[in-house]
Amino acid sequence: MFLWLAHFSNWLTGLNIFQYTTFRAVMAALTALAFSLMFGPWTIRRLTALKCGQAVRTDGPQTHLVKNGTPTMGGSLILTAITVSTLLWGNWANPYIWILLGVLLATGALGFYDDWRKVVYKDPNGVSAKFKMVWQSSVAVIAGLALFYLAANSANNILIVPFFKQIALPLGVVGFLVLSYLTIVGTSNAVNLTDGLDGLAAFPVVLVAAGLAIFAYVSGHYQFSQYLQLPYVAGANEVAIFCTAMCGACLGFLWFNAYPAQVFMGDVGALALGAALGTVAVIVRQEFVLVIMGGLFVVEAVSVMLQVGWYKKTKKRIFLMAPIHHHYEQKGWKETQVVVRFWIITIVLVLIGLSTLKIR
């Protein structure tokens, strides 16, 4: 919204700063951060008053039983902060902004309904897996179709392999949709599985979103993208504003979600943030880079799939408990140790992902 102020730069030279993506990206992060910090206490009080307490699973780590009753659905604060900040600092004429907000709010609505069922019916399992998959699939397919037909040229419909500049595989509409589906739905569920300890998901989301913001900014500038041999995606630079808004909103939320957590983000936050990260990766054609930078999310999801699959086949477990962060808790790691060590791993992975900008 503030972008329109740049049109009056002839009257007041200082207003010209609003046309710069970098300035608006920084301001989007600060706005979302301030929003989360300002409305965080009110959100916690409101969720507590509405008795939106988390029903802790009895088959989980026994140390988590003390968390029973902690307000959940705090992700609604994150989503509101991202939406407000993006609308204030983003370019409303950019279709990617609306696709990202649509994915964020649509999957957020699913998460909200899931959390609401858990709160009202005291059912830790929430909505059925089938219902959740149908909803997520619908959002992913619609977003994938929109992004495919927005592509300006065939370079926007290729599969980029990190570290190899000569490998770029054409996808076509079916391949593009399949890859978009796997990226959006997979990341949504992976982030949701990661959100099992205080602060475990929030900060890695900040790190990955920051990394993707750099890719978005570079991909949206023809000279930069050509120099780094990345596909040029016209308008992708505005996606960086959405990403930095996500960073600010999650950092502000982390203030209240840090151990011992005053509030949990719930599915309303985790499902939406994961889907948004996946959509950004599809826009900038960096699905494999997302796998690298979001390696923590991948490992968490794979640990669950391996555990379930192996148990169904052999009636034995690979891990003491899944997702894998609970495995390390069962081995004697303190919750804070697991969280900080997983943060460190994510920092390293994001740096490796960023190295693909130049190492080819």
From Swiss-Prot:
Cofactor(s) required for function per UniProt: Mg(2+)
Catalyzed reactions: UDP-N-acetyl-alpha-D-muramoyl-L-alanyl-gamma-D-glutamyl-meso-2,6-diaminopimeloyl-D-alanyl-D-alanine + di-trans,octa-cis-undecaprenyl phosphate = di-trans,octa-cis-undecaprenyl diphospho-N-acetyl-alpha-D-muramoyl-L-alanyl-D-glutamyl-meso-2,6-diaminopimeloyl-D-alanyl-D-alanine + UMP
TM region(s), chain numbering: 24-44, 69-89, 92-112, 133-153, 158-178, 199-219, 239-259, 263-283, 288-308, 337-357
Presence of keyword Transferase: yes
Pathway as given in its UniProt record: Cell wall biogenesis; peptidoglycan biosynthesis
Enzyme class: transferase
Entry annotated with the keyword NADP: no
Gene Ontology biological process: cell division; cell wall organization; peptidoglycan biosynthetic process; regulation of cell shape
Pfam families, sorted: Glycos_transf_4 (PF00953)
GO-annotated molecular function: metal ion binding; phospho-N-acetylmuramoyl-pentapeptide-transferase activity; UDP-N-acetylmuramoyl-L-alanyl-D-glutamyl-meso-2,6-diaminopimelyl-D-alanyl-D-alanine:undecaprenyl-phosphate transferase activity
GO CC annotations on file: plasma membrane
Record localization: Cell inner membrane
Membrane topology: Multi-pass membrane protein
Disulfide links within the chain: none
Taxonomy, superkingdom: Bacteria
Main location as per UniProt: membrane
Signal peptide bounds: none
Keywords: Cell cycle, Cell division, Cell inner membrane, Cell membrane, Cell shape, Cell wall biogenesis/degradation, Magnesium, Membrane, Metal-binding, Peptidoglycan synthesis, Transferase, Transmembrane, Transmembrane helix
Database matches in PROSITE patterns: MRAY_1 (PS01347), MRAY_2 (PS01348)
Enzyme Commission number(s) from the entry: 2.7.8.13
Family note: Belongs to the glycosyltransferase 4 family. MraY subfamily.
Protein function: Catalyzes the initial step of the lipid cycle reactions in the biosynthesis of the cell wall peptidoglycan: transfers peptidoglycan precursor phospho-MurNAc-pentapeptide from UDP-MurNAc-pentapeptide onto the lipid carrier undecaprenyl phosphate, yielding undecaprenyl-pyrophosphoryl-MurNAc-pentapeptide, known as lipid I.
Protein name: Phospho-N-acetylmuramoyl-pentapeptide-transferase
UniProt organism field: Neisseria gonorrhoeae (strain ATCC 700825 / FA 1090)
